[in-house]
């Protein structure tokens, strides 16, 4: 009997304890709810909308670039801010309210905002731009913006008038773009003036006992510029040390063989020992200038440059690079380099600007001073941020015009924003190789891209969704 009474007493205690626990839990939930409502009420979004708590940072590595550190927010319902919808998942942003000067826009990759009344612009990354899915039908207030800093070989159809003129705003390597990225691989004028890696000419002359006068470092072989064909021919007239996968005849130390090490101090020290470096781009386009040009200038090595036809507009000084386009044949170029190699005074004329720390090109200085973004600079926006804000600001400019009863300003890209001629074969060799990537791949690809551009434009102008089958049927239509 005593045992039964004890069990009843224990059960009663457990019930009382459970009741107290539930009451305390309920009170905590109520208090938390009050706190969340207070936080919601005091958020800084205008028109009473909620600013959600930030999640941990999201890293998105850009091709060939330093990873961008990007924040994202959970979700935001808004009818007060223009929505900038990234149609390419470049940033990974699920939702972020961005400040662009006095303007604010909501940036997202969430395609559920496609039909939202405040969606004003669609942002595309050129390499990812394809026909599989486009935001159609396109409404009158829908702006399209293109970000494309890379080689045309990544997406040739963008470089034809029918496609490039689909976009209202651009950020490309061209100086004519709405946001020029021509100097995207140059940190600033100070790195050009720096003597940190400069090897004295006397030392370079001594090093010539074991090093060639020229160095070539490429691992992207047989690109549209056909640079390997030129260098292969040049090698028959002058010695070239070739690292990398293309025409390799010399090995880097094991720790420097990874492409990621091409900005390593050890790699710089090796390359800086040479007198000349073959700086050949993978494509020939106006203002398409990569690290292949800027790196030797930073190291105190004379670049032997082939690529942008407009490169003379971007030289630090009038005599700071040897331009391949000024020589009719690789043999002539080899003879000139050999002459400089044996004449210190002639050679020093190409590095005099470096020794004096004088960058005289006003176009280059102005471009560096006025650009709205930085390279590897934590104190400046990166060029993705600058692109987003350019579009945001232009959208707001039109909103303000319409609020005044004025028509919006219509922006439109043109072919100068991505100017690349058809890939061409070098005419120096009378005997063509049995197989050439240029003849067999890049020239046919360029020709087909013309048809793709025309087909895409016709389908987009029709302003309704289309299938891949419809697209390719138009491309290959007789």
Curated annotation (Swiss-Prot):
Any one GO molecular function term: alpha-(1->3)-fucosyltransferase activity
EC number in record: 2.4.1.221, 2.4.1.-
Enzyme category, top tier: transferase
Record keywords: Disulfide bond, Endoplasmic reticulum, Glycoprotein, Glycosyltransferase, Membrane, Signal-anchor, Transferase, Transmembrane, Transmembrane helix
Membrane disposition: Single-pass type II membrane protein
Disulphide-bonded residues: 389-392
InterPro entries documented for this protein: Alpha-1_3-FUT_met (IPR017176), Glyco_tran_10_C (IPR055270), Glyco_tran_10_N (IPR031481), Glyco_trans_10 (IPR001503), GT10-like_C_sf (IPR038577)
GO biological process, one term: fucosylation
Entry's family note: Belongs to the glycosyltransferase 10 family.
PANTHER family: ALPHA- 1,3 -FUCOSYLTRANSFERASE, ALPHA-(1,3)-FUCOSYLTRANSFERASE 10
Function field: Protein O-fucosyltransferase that specifically catalyzes O-fucosylation of serine or threonine residues in EMI domains of target proteins, such as MMRN1, MMRN2 and EMID1. Attaches fucose through an O-glycosidic linkage. O-fucosylation of EMI domain-containing proteins may be required for facilitating protein folding and secretion. May also show alpha-(1,3)-fucosyltransferase activity toward the innermost N-acetyl glucosamine (GlcNAc) residue in biantennary N-glycan acceptors. However, this was tested with a library of synthetic substrates and this activity is unsure in vivo.
Name used for this protein in its record: GDP-fucose protein O-fucosyltransferase 3
Lineage of origin: Eukaryota, Metazoa, Chordata, Craniata, Vertebrata
Gene: FUT10
């Amino acid at each position: 009997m005593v045992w039964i009474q004890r069990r009843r007493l224990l059960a009663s205690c457990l019930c009382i304890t459970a009741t107290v626990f539930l009451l305390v839990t309920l009170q905590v939930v109520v208090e938390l709810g009050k706190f969340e409502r207070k936080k919601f009420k005091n958020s800084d979004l205008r028109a009473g909308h909620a600013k959600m708590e930030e999640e941990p940072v999201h890293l998105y590595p850009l091709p060939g670039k330093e990873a961008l550190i990007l924040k994202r927010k959970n979700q935001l319902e808004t009818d007060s801010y223009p929505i900038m919808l990234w149609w390419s998942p470049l940033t990974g942003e699920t939702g972020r309210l961005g400040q662009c000067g006095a303007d604010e826009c909501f940036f997202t990759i969430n395609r559920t905002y496609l039909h939202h009344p405040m969606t004003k612009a669609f942002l595309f990354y050129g390499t990812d731009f394809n026909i599989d899915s486009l935001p159609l039908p396109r409404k009158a207030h829908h702006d399209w913006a293109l970000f494309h800093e890379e080689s045309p070989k990544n997406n040739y159809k963008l470089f034809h008038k029918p496609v490039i003129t689909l976009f209202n705003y651009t950020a490309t390597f061209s100086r004519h773009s709405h946001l020029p990225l021509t100097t995207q691989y140059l940190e600033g004028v100070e790195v050009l003036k720096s003597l940190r890696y400069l090897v004295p000419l006397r030392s370079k002359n001594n090093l010539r006992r074991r090093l060639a006068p020229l160095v070539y470092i490429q691992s992207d072989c047989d690109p549209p510029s056909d640079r390997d064909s030129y260098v292969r021919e040049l090698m028959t007239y002058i010695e070239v040390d070739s690292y990398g996968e293309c025409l390799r005849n010399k090995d880097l130390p094991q720790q420097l063989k990874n492409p990621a090490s091409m900005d390593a101090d050890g790699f710089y020290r090796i390359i800086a020992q040479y007198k000349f470096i073959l700086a050949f781009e993978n494509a020939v386009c106006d203002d398409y200038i990569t690290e292949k040009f800027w790196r030797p200038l930073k190291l105190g090595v004379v670049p032997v440059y082939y690529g942008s036809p407009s490169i003379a507009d971007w030289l630090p000084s009038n005599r700071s690079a040897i331009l391949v386009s000024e020589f009719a044949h690789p043999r002539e170029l080899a003879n000139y380099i050999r002459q400089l190699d044996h004449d210190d005074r002639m050679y020093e004329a190409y590095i005099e600007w470096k020794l004096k720390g004088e960058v005289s090109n006003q176009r280059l200085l102005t471009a560096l001073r006025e650009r709205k973004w930085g390279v590897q600079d934590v104190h400046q926006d990166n060029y993705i941020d600058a692109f987003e804000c350019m579009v945001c600001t232009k959208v707001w400019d039109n909103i303000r015009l319409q609020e005044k009863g004025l028509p919006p300003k219509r922006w439109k890209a043109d072919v100068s924003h991505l100017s690349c001629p058809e890939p061409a074969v070098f005419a120096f060799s009378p005997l063509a190789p049995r197989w050439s990537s240029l003849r067999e791949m890049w020239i046919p690809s360029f020709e087909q891209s013309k048809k793709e551009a025309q087909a895409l434009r016709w389908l987009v102008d029709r302003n309704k969704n289309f299938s891949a089958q419809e697209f390719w049927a138009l491309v290959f239509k007789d």
